[in-house]
């Protein structure tokens, strides 16, 4: 048998140490735990009218439990966004609709701007995904209007669902 030089012995020892180190890494590896992340969707915070800093004369928030709506049997919500071109086109029809139904005592018409932070709870509650959206709240159900946004069709929708 041939004698190994000191350089070969050092290389063999280093190779053995390297192999043992790799085996220990593979076998004794700690499980990787994900780091804590802040949830992407923050819990919604409902602003009560008496707790915010907005002057009550300027408040435009309406909630399903608002005392203003409790004496009204029916509420027609119009969800819009000022930057939406379809909402701008529909605004004249909405104004005529408000004038036509102004004299009906048990119907309240509410215009809700989806870009205002104080209306976020309504947008979430009624699951508003697009604007303009019209929802008629009756004593027993909520009806989303999906037809033509003409004055005649909306009037027919309101009258037919109020006379059930």
Curated annotation (Swiss-Prot):
PROSITE patterns: THIOREDOXIN_2. InterPro entries: PDI, Thioredoxin-like_sf, Thioredoxin_domain. It is found in: Host membrane; Virion. Keywords: Disulfide bond, Host membrane, Membrane, Redox-active center, Transmembrane, Transmembrane helix, Virion. Disulfide bonds join 84-87. Residues 36-163 form the Thioredoxin domain. One of its GO terms (cellular component) is membrane. Belongs to the thioredoxin family. This is Thioredoxin domain-containing protein R443.
């Amino acid at each position: 048998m041939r004698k190994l030089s000191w350089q070969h012995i050092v290389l063999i020892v280093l190779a053995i140490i390297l192999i043992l180190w790799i085996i220990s890494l593979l076998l004794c590896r700690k499980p990787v735990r994900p780091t804590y992340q802040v949830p992407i969707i923050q819990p919604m915070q409902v602003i009560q009218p008496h707790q915010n800093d907005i002057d009550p004369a300027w408040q435009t928030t309406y909630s399903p439990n608002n005392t203003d709506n409790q004496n009204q049997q029916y509420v027609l919500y119009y969800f819009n966004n000022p930057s939406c071109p379809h909402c701008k086109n529909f605004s004249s029809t909405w104004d005529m609709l408000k004038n036509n139904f102004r004299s009906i005592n048990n119907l309240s018409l509410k215009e809700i701007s989806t870009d205002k932070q104080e209306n976020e709870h309504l947008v979430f509650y009624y699951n508003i995904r697009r604007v303009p959206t019209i929802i008629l709240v009756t004593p027993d159900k909520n009806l989303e209007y999906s037809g033509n946004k003409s004055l005649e069709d909306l009037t027919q929708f309101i009258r037919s669902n109020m006379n059930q």
